[in-house]
């Protein structure tokens, strides 16, 4: 069963923003300031720049393959099911932990007003958001829009009203712990951008994903990164260093300093909105990873069951909610560090995935958005992420390694038995070694994804192309040689003597040339048998003489009865649109085999033929 496409640009913007803005900005700045000093705003901005590399890579991948599971789906199709399983588990764990941490943060702030144990408050909201996401993703996203707009408004107000109260002496010296501390602290605060890439996990539910996903992701990242930096500058400029270094509520303290209890209340509400939006977006995004893993047969089928009424993956959502509730009782600080390291690993995989899938040169990889500065942007991102990862320390790396081992265990003892999947790395190996490792299955899957993405209806021309053979000819041919070959190859299928076919083509060519250009010729035959339509495609990579042309690379022979004249004309129009595409000739000549030639004919953009009434 398909997921509903209900999310638009404002939904994606708010989902991305709501996933990012949380404890990373409302709690961490005080601790981070003790590591970097007043230059902390640079650390936040550097972390945002690195996050941009992953966001751009994921935006391209999401426009090529808008499927539930986001980065897990892309990694699996690029690096293989083993690495894909690792990616899915890491991503799910990272978002789930961050969401749990947001619930705890929310409980701490609510404790100002409610005299309940913070864990029980967090549990209540965990159940609430789980139910909200079961009811439907659109209902959850509407809630997200309201929360994020209110949150961003209060953050902007804090900056605008706080700037006049900045004291110069609090900003100096700007880097008391050295320049290197700025970079290491960027790793510490990187979790602040933790929800950004996870928006792609709901890409299958997005309207017009080719534009909506990249625009929503990049606009969200730009606005949030600027707001983070400005808010940190305001808090740093208002609070003395010795106070800010020890504060777990830095913006509340800064707001109280310039605006009293009213501003403290406003910032408390802002923090609560941030935690609410992160928890809600976290359950929505995290639950799509078990769903995607299950749909790929990596984990049991129950995780991919979709509720008939609400069209949401109920068991996957409930399972994620249960695990989040368990995390509420654990050491949140340690889990937050592990979440940060697993998040960085997923960013590394995102950039690596784009490089591999681009270099595989797969015919059906057709993103609507392409990363600028490829591959330099991705290489810069990978190197930067590796630096941040090793800055986090040995213990955190060991815990992340345990998660990787667990993911491999799941794949080896369940997923590997259930499924054998093609992936882009195999296509890249084919390019390097000239050996055959694939059966074109990934290309076919990508074709179906493109059809779903672009809402392409399979028309009669598609069906005709799919059922008929494409002839891939080697060497250069004279006019007589190519006519003999065409006549011989089509004679049996048409049940016509090969000499009659040859003579008919020659006679037709004398009356009027059938070459559409110096690249393609479209001869045709009239069949006496009623209701008959056949089409044969020939690629002559080294060229052939045909009529007056000396170097034709493509011949399309159409054989049809007189009562199929209408479809004959529509097919000619379809072929003309295909061969006039600016990329067609290059793709036609670079295709490796008959299957790739057929994919070009099926997926080159054209108007579809509507069935006759």
Residue ranges and their predicted role:
Residues 31-34, 43, 52-126, 130-134, ...:
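Hydrophobic transmembrane alpha-helices that form the core helical bundles
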Residues 143, 303-312, 347-397:
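C-terminal membrane-solvent junction of multi-pass transporters and transport-like membrane proteins
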